Amino acid sequence: RIHKRRAKKGFRKAQRLERIGKLPSIEDRPKEADKRKEIGHFEDDTIVSRQSLIRVKSINERASGVVFLGKMSDGTNKESTRVVCERLSSLPSSFRKTLTRDRGMENMGWTDIERALSLKVYFAHSYCSYERGSNENLNGLVRRFFPKKTNFAKVTDEEIRKVEYLLNTRPRKRFGGKTPLEVLLEKTG
C-alpha cells in the first residue's frame, strides 16, 4: 500500500508582545477570585470560527458560573473590548471586580476595559489555559451548541442569547443541582 504524502502545515509566526509592555499577572489577582466565594470575578475567552472572521466572546463569572456570550465582528482588540463592555456594563459596579484573560492580541485593549467598567484586568501566563479553567470548560459547553465547523456569520444574536440562557439555567453538579442564576441570586441577596 502506498501512502500519500502529507502537505506541510503552515505555521503562523509567534505574535510579539514585547511592544505592549508588562501585563498585569494572574499572580497579582486577589485570592478571593481563586476561592470562588465572592461575586464579581470574571474570565473571558474568544471562540473562533473556521468559516468566517466572526467570533464569539465567552465571559463567565467564577463564583456563580453565570455566562455572558457576545458576537464579535472580527478579532481586533477594539471589537473584543466593545463586546466585554457591552455585556458587563449592565451589572452593578459592585459586581465588577476582576477580569482574567489570555495574552491573545484581541485582549490588548485591557486598559479601556479597566476605565469603562472600573474593574482590574489580569492576564494568565502564556500557554497556561488551565489558569482560566472555568472559562475553558464553558467553551466546551458552548461548543456543544456550536461545533467546530459552525460558521458564526450564520448564527443570529437571538441564537447566541438562547444558548446563554440555556447555560445559565442548566443545573450544575458543583452547585448541588442549582443553576448559575439561582446561585447568583443567592449570593447577591
Task: Label the predicted regions.
Residues R1-D34:
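Basic, flexible linker segments flanking DNA-binding modules
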Residues R36, G40, K149-T150:
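Glycine-centered loop/turn motifs
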Residues I39-S49:
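Two-metal-ion RNase H-like nuclease active-site motif
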Residues I47, Q51-F68:
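Short conserved beta-strand segments at catalytic cores or DNA/RNA-binding microdomains
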Residues S49-S52, L69-S93:
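Active-site beta-loop-alpha junctions of metal-dependent nucleic acid enzymes
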Residues S64-F68, L91-R96, F145-F146:
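Short, surface-exposed connector motifs at secondary-structure boundaries
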Residues S94-G109, Y127:
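Acidic/histidine-rich, metal-coordinating catalytic segments
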Residues G104, I113-G189:
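Charged alpha-helix within mobile-element recombinases
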